[in-house]
Amino acid sequence: MTDLAPLRRALLSVSDKTGLVALGKALAARGVELLSTGGTARALRDAGLEVKDVAEVTGFPEMMDGRVKTLHPAVHGGLLALRDNDDHLAAMQEHGIAGIDLVVVNLYPFEQTVAKGAQYDEVIENIDIGGPAMIRSAAKNHGFVSVVVDVEDYDVLIAQLEAYDGHTTYALRQRLAQTAYARTAAYDTAVSTWMAAQVGEPPRRRSFGGTLAQTLRYGENPHQDAAFYLDGSNSPGVATARQLQGKELSYNNINDTDAAFELVSEFDQGDGPACAIIKHANPCGVARAETLTEAYRRAFDCDRTSAFGGIIALNQPLDGATAEEISSIFTEVVIAPGADAEAQEVFAKKKNLRLLTTDGLADPTAPGLAIRQVSGGYLVQDRDTGRLSADALQIVTKRAPSDQEMADLMFAWTVAKHVKSNAIIYVKDGATVGVGAGQMSRVDSTRIAARKAQDMAEAMGLPAPLTQGSVVASDAFFPFADGLITAAEAGATALIQPGGSMRDDEVIAAADEAGLAMVFTGMRHFRH
């Protein structure tokens, strides 16, 4: 190993040609011999650069539709040979192997091929073999060899060659090697994850990979370090959103914004405007209305106190009128499919407010994984993509819900899916009026939601509690009748819950006695 290693010979083989020609010219200007393959070689030659085909080095042509190009001792010997080991140098001389001091590789676009929904055979052909092999060989020998797998490192390499007269430092080579191993690990993770989906059963080993998007100021609390990584998904959401203005997103901003956007994406744009306001990953107000402004107002009226400093998600592009309403209180983040010029002009006066646009909504039915770390391991499950139609509900009481009650029950059930358990949601006319979240007993969630609704009615000067004439959703069954009775006392007229308790008969009897309509979903929406 040496600190300064000369760079005399480089092998370039990339799928993403971004910055390739500029890098090639910078290397050639320093007298570096360029080796390459296929399309990369053509791109360099088209730019007027002298390039030697790898086939000239190996003595073998590319074969098997390009599957075999660089898998040869003339390549890997040139990468792996220790430059300060006499035996290695003798072997190189004996077999006519010349050293390769730099490998520039970015891999076949496997992740992008999967993301676009390609057929099985196309996905298989986009599993890179030679690229990862060269990356790993070069990275292992980083004492002498540089390996670049990220376009963003091209300028770093060029700057170092200029600063050290055609040499690289050990510190840079070591960092590049770490980046390289992280890339091959993430690549293999993507392939393994896709293969596991084809097999259809949990794999014996599972890895998770991502690309650093942002080093955060801190995590949930100031004493915790944190960073934000991307998994390569192109689905609309906080990870792919465009930030139009405002301060850098924090750890908690990202977490809450994701929760808000996932919730509001449950409501199709074609079914009308919807708004969700989130605090600490729980909704403090959700509503639908004829206009986006009215949807925001109704969501805000559910819990005006908690909405302060919250995250707002919209299912339609933000307009100027809604932006004016939102600007009246302190808001951390607004995320929407878009924002018109008037809305952006309004928010420009609020320099710290973060505005994100997504160019669409997330697909709540898209398959995926939910991952949680526990001491010594991970819990992995499918995303909760469960959805129900009114036709799938079981009416279990003497009275059936009215059409309006049924519409509100379906709305409440959708919201309950996104509330921390134990979750109780009061809804009236397409808007939440009370949310009980995260309590250890279901009856406490029922009481808290009703109490908050009553407090809000008093603050707004209304003559009756907001829960009067509402419906209630429970994310899991009522283990006793007390929660249902509490909801009835608060003025609820109908309930939706999974059912399945050993005391279902008691709960149904209590509903009938109170004149409530109740439906069972047969589906639970625990959220922890």
Swiss-Prot record:
Gene3D superfamilies referenced in this protein's UniProt entry, alphabetically: 3.40.140.20, Methylglyoxal synthase-like domain (3.40.50.1380)
Pathway(s) annotated for this protein in UniProt: Purine metabolism; IMP biosynthesis via de novo pathway; 5-formamido-1-(5-phospho-D-ribosyl)imidazole-4-carboxamide from 5-amino-1-(5-phospho-D-ribosyl)imidazole-4-carboxamide (10-formyl THF route): step 1/1; Purine metabolism; IMP biosynthesis via de novo pathway; IMP from 5-formamido-1-(5-phospho-D-ribosyl)imidazole-4-carboxamide: step 1/1
Stored SMART domains: AICARFT_IMPCHas, MGS
Signal peptide: none
Reaction equation(s) it catalyzes: (6R)-10-formyltetrahydrofolate + 5-amino-1-(5-phospho-beta-D-ribosyl)imidazole-4-carboxamide = 5-formamido-1-(5-phospho-D-ribosyl)imidazole-4-carboxamide + (6S)-5,6,7,8-tetrahydrofolate; IMP + H2O = 5-formamido-1-(5-phospho-D-ribosyl)imidazole-4-carboxamide
Record GO terms (molecular function): IMP cyclohydrolase activity; phosphoribosylaminoimidazolecarboxamide formyltransferase activity
UniProt xrefs under CDD domains: IMPCH (cd01421)
Family: Belongs to the PurH family.
Name of the protein in its database record: Bifunctional purine biosynthesis protein PurH
